[in-house]
Every structure is written in structure tokens, then in C-alpha cells.
Amino acid sequence: SVKEKLSDMKYEYEIEAEFDYIFKHSGQSHAYAPIVASGKNACTLHYSDNNQKLKKGSFVLMDIGARVSGYAADITRTYAYGEPTKRQIAVHEQVKNAHEAIIDMLAPDLGIEEYQRNVMEIMGAAVAELGLVKSPQDEKVMRYFPHAVSHGLGIDVHDALGRPRYFQPGMVLTVEPGIYIPEEAIGIRIEDDLLVTEKGHRNLSRSLSTGW
């Protein structure tokens, strides 16, 4: 896997090239322009240069998905390059815990507005736990979590879900919490692709390790 080969790579573009090879060797293609962002580059949400040298002791964020049979995947993992600091591990753990808590909520008939409120409570608590804001309700939470947690996924990477009031079986969406701390050069996001089922949900990308 790319995670196992990461320590042998020196530049962001080498990681991108590894995915290029894997996808083309399988007769598939990228669903969108890949993001390979190390260190502070991960704080730029749609970073696309993918040309910086990897630095030991940093995290590498990889937002990459294949297009297979016309359908897109959209997956993000953030892995350590070298030995991470306690602070980096703490941020990663908060994102991982939030990711799991948000996924656990997904079920048919869950209200979209309720989902959004719960997401902000979870992310607010995570950001506050890291000492970045004074309380989970602080408006500055959005400084460290500045994007939506989910979008529809299908033929288009950002597929339209319509305007439903509740989640419904058959919907496919991403769950992608992240915490970005530019002043500490830490940007961590974990993203999976979820199918809402009759009884709950199915994680379509669960086989990929979410650990650091």
C-alpha cells in the first residue's frame, strides 16, 4: 500500500505518481485532480501543486479517488511521515474520533438539519479539546474546520442529493471532518464514502486504514 511505501518517498509528486500507476495499471483514472499535501500545505483545502519535498516529522494529507465504471470515489487519509509529535497525534486522534462519531449517526430518517447541528457540536468539542477555542460554541471553531462535512457522491464527485429533509436509503455521501492549524503547520482530514441503507449505513471505503 502507499502507506507502507511512504517512508521511501521524498516528494509529494512521488506519492501522486504511485496512485497514477495503480489507477492506470487497473484500467481506471482519477475522479478529480489529486491532492497530496504535506505539512502546512495540508491547511490549503484545494492544494494542487503536489511538488514539495516531504519533511520528516510532518503529516501527509492525500485526497484521492478513482473513477470506476463511471462512478467516483472521494477518499482522504492523513499519515505520518517519520515520527509524529504528541501534538500532531492529539490532533489526528480528535479528527479520527469525530469521523467515527459522525459516521455512527448516519441512518435513514435522520434529519439533515439535525445532522448538521450534531456535526458542529462534535467538531466544536474536538477543537475546544485541543485548546484552540475557549468553548465548543465559539465562532472561531470555523477557523479550524472551515468546510462542509459531507457532499453527495456518484457520477459526479460532488453529486446533487436534491434538497431532502432527511437521509434516505440509497444516498451516497462523504464524511470528511478535518482540523487545520496553519500556525502549527498541521492539517488533518479523514474522509470516507458512505451508503445510507435501510438499517443504517455502509462504509464503502472502510478497508483503508484511518490510523496515522
Regions found by a protein language model. Name each.
Residues 1-212:
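Active-site neighborhoods and metal-handling regions in enzymes and metal-associated proteins
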